[in-house]
């Protein structure tokens, strides 16, 4: 999916913010999920994504136990949070500055956030998520240190070569993020 992070805080009267600190596993509930991120234009350490490597195995208070994807997409609550929330760690995050066309793969359990600056330059990147069913079938995945959601959102992923494959059943393949998400 194409992600655009404007350098302005407001566009057409809407407040636009980069995504705050979060783990994607808080929403997906899938510990074996891998995120792929590719910038399309040059980055700076103030216009990029940041990660907190030291928080990978550190539990963080969050509201993943009560956050509900179905409530988000229902549109009934215009102020419903886009993702589970936490308090940003006191330690500084590490900015990711890679070249356009380089690809960053990282665990969905990695705490990360978006950054934008007032340079007037918007950030354009491509991101997607994948799950290898062999990892699921073998019980492999990142340590779940603090995700408390009760639902695994397999509907976010589509098997590219094995339509209808359900984790835990015979067959192996990579599940990639669905177009409709």
Language model features by range: what are they?
Residues 1-44, 49:
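Conserved double-stranded beta-helix
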Residues 12, 46-48, 59-61, 116, ...:
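Short acidic, gly/pro-rich beta-turn/loop elements at beta-sheet edges
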Residues 24-25, 92-94, 112-115:
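Generic recognition of flexible, low-complexity loop/linker segments
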């Amino acid at each position: 999916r194409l992600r655009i992070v404007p350098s302005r805080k407001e566009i057409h009267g809407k407040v636009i913010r980069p995504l705050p600190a979060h783990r994607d596993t808080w929403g997906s509930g899938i510990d074996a999920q891998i995120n792929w991120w590719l910038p399309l234009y040059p980055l700076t350490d103030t216009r990029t994504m940041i990660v907190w490597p030291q928080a990978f195995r550190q539990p963080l208070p969050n509201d993943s136990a009560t956050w509900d994807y179905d409530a988000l997409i229902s549109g009934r609550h215009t102020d419903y949070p886009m993702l589970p929330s936490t308090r940003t760690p006191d330690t500084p995050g590490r900015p990711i500055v890679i070249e356009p066309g380089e690809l960053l793969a990282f665990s969905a359990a990695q705490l990360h956030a978006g950054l934008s600056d007032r340079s007037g330059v918007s950030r354009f990147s491509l991101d997607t998520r994948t799950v290898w069913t062999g990892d699921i079938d073998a019980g492999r995945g990142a340590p779940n240190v603090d995700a408390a959601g009760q639902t695994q959102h397999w509907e976010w992923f589509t098997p590219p070569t094995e339509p209808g494959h359900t984790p835990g059943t015979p067959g192996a393949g990579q599940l990639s993020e669905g177009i409709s998400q």
